[in-house]
């Protein structure tokens, strides 16, 4: 009985420490929020950090152009015609604050912070590796809007080089989607062959800010190759060494809680995933595509995709079979994936994420009930053996070998497995941890209301009611557990303080996570009553 309590206590403390440590390990500097808007005119950017091809090094630009504004049902984007970079992206359907009209801004370029997506052509004849600097594209207008009844919106930019070659860069936006197609069309009207190579990169300022009392999640880079399905690449690691990974397909991304931006080149192309950190403190991660040779009179099309939006697993999987891994469930992903599917299934019926959390908690607890019953049955049997075990201790004294042998004979005679109460606990832990991470990583819970005073399941309870109720439920569970007379007094005190410790620990947790834990405790209390009633009938309590 004491060993089972020890394992339960150690297990709870270990899980708590593991979750806390995982958050701290994944913590990365988060840029300070700023209310500054994007500069009205697109100032030129130094292109020294644009990746080099076999020949040609980009030079600093000197042109200045007006930004091009693009509005769809999901995105509000601004494009710098100098190079054709996306320098601003607001997510129209995701608000900065609940109840406010201001959209969540993912990409921006302000005085103190840069987070933009660049793409271009490098190589011997690349327009972004010319001594004159990056190309200054021309557009037919500066404002583009996805009209009602229109499924796609094309934003064409054109550049004519000194040799007469026409380069067209087209941004294709889609209704209801956060991915943008970037298509280059090169019409070689010159008398000489051309050689170009497409690249795409994401640049973000490495700048720390004050962290909130809620434990932070990962913010930094990530990439995928044919050999490495998913790898985080922290800013501090990027500062130490540069990536240069050849691959077929692949992708490069910047991650933060709930949101992601990513370059996804064609899966059949030979690419190189690269990274660097510029002297100005900008972290860059991106890809270099294949080198194309374009004969005189020929036309070549080169394409890639860019995603800027929430960590929507369905949308991400449609772009790459590994991009959905940015929703990182850790080593228990194989459990978390079906749990997330079930959570989505319940929400599609009830229309409330809080109710869906309750339903999935009930489902998990229901499926684990046989293990829970086995656990408490074993604990009851061990409890009934305590007087006999105490007699063995008094009989054999310090002779541990004989006492151990006698205890094993007693267990065998009474048909009791001393580890029977521990194994169910150990089997349940992975499921509960996986469910925990599903609730933490699911962007769907952001700004999702429940009922009454809970208006956002992704933030802490403003009145701390749920954590207090959770603490009360733990106290009730503890009182329902019989305490063995032989239990160490220090251990008893530690167990008594557990509800208080967990209550304080959960004060700043997202209310969705606390709701899950509270409902789980309530169900556990009911299950204990049912199990104990059955044990009393068998004379085991």
Curated annotation (Swiss-Prot):
GO terms for cellular component: plasma membrane. InterPro entries: Membr_insert_YidC (IPR019998), Membr_insert_YidC_N (IPR028053), YidC/ALB3/OXA1/COX18 (IPR001708), YidC/Oxa/ALB_C (IPR028055), YidC_ALB_C (IPR047196), YidC_periplasmic_sf (IPR038221). One of its GO terms (molecular function) is membrane insertase activity. Belongs to the OXA1/ALB3/YidC family. Type 1 subfamily. Interacts with the Sec translocase complex via SecD. Specifically interacts with transmembrane segments of nascent integral membrane proteins during membrane integration. It is a multi-pass membrane protein. Its main location: membrane. The gene is yidC. Disulfide bonds: none annotated. One of its GO terms (biological process) is protein insertion into membrane. Required for the insertion and/or proper folding and/or complex formation of integral membrane proteins into the membrane. Involved in integration of membrane proteins that insert both dependently and independently of the Sec translocase complex, as well as at least some lipoproteins. Aids folding of multispanning membrane proteins. The chain crosses the membrane at residues 6-26, 349-369, 420-440, 457-477, 500-520. This is Membrane protein insertase YidC. It is found in: Cell inner membrane. It comes from the Bacteria. Pfam families: 60KD_IMP, YidC_periplas. Keywords: Cell inner membrane, Cell membrane, Chaperone, Membrane, Protein transport, Transmembrane, Transmembrane helix, Transport.
